[in-house]
Amino acid sequence: MASKEEIIAKAKDAITDFDEELAAEVAEEALAAGIDPVELIEKGFTAGMQEVGEQFEQGSLFLPHVLAAAEAMNTGMEVIKPEMEKRKSETKSLGTVVIGTIEGDIHSIGKDIVASMLNIAGFKVVDLGRDVPIKTFVEKAKEVKPQIIASSALMTTTMVNQIQIEEQLKEAGIRDQVKTMVGGAPVTQDWADKIGADLYGESATDVVSKVRAVLL
């Protein structure tokens, strides 16, 4: 029987090799071996996605490769999901996070990974999807009263819209009732500080650890 390290390494390989079948197999193998699904995702699937993302930024991989890697990860996650849902039903929600990719931006891979990781970590996630109008973030904040609103921007031309979330939350009179978090490829801590966001998420694991720190 393969060791935990070998199974996690295979999970990473499944993503970097764009192998959906292997992703499903290794997810089943991990569950059978009693490996913590969160560890499998963080050290296997997410690590693989980060490697693919880096190669994409360097120009050695292209968008179809990134999409294929994301599909492989989604396939593996589907296998793990029932176990995660079972765990969630046994523990109360740790808090609510509204998340979405900002208006004008159709990219959702990074946001999808973050949403999955938060879900797995025990938070209730309200995923608004991609190309989300600013007013939708605000309306959803009024409706579900989350602790955190997280927006992702994958382009410099759309990250400016993150300023509007801050402004419109103030106009709605609810800015002081919620923490805001920003992330995405062009987004930095300096940008978060400049626009007045409470938190900056550099990676999926960074987001989870910072959300935990704020809410727990």
From Swiss-Prot:
One Pfam family named in its UniProt record: B12-binding
Residue ranges annotated for the B12-binding N-terminal domain, each copy included: 1-92
Binding sites annotated in the UniProt record for methylcob(III)alamin: 107
CDD domains: corrinoid_protein_B12-BD (cd02070)
Domain of life of the organism encoding this protein: Archaea
GO terms, molecular function: cobalamin binding; cobalt ion binding; methyltransferase activity
Pathway: One-carbon metabolism; methanogenesis from trimethylamine
A biological-process GO annotation: methanogenesis
Signal sequence extent: none
Location of the B12-binding domain: 94-216
Keywords annotated in UniProt: Cobalt, Metal-binding, Methanogenesis, Repeat
UniProt-listed Gene3D superfamilies: Cobalamin-binding domain, Methionine synthase domain
PANTHER family: METHIONINE SYNTHASE
Family as reported in the entry's similarity comment: Belongs to the methylamine corrinoid protein family.
Annotated function: Acts probably as a methyl group carrier between MttB and either MtbA or MtaA.
Assembly description: Can form a complex with MttB.
Protein name, as recorded: Trimethylamine corrinoid protein 1
Organism, as annotated: Methanosarcina acetivorans (strain ATCC 35395 / DSM 2834 / JCM 12185 / C2A)
Organism taxonomic ancestry: Archaea, Methanobacteriati, Methanobacteriota, Stenosarchaea group, Methanomicrobia
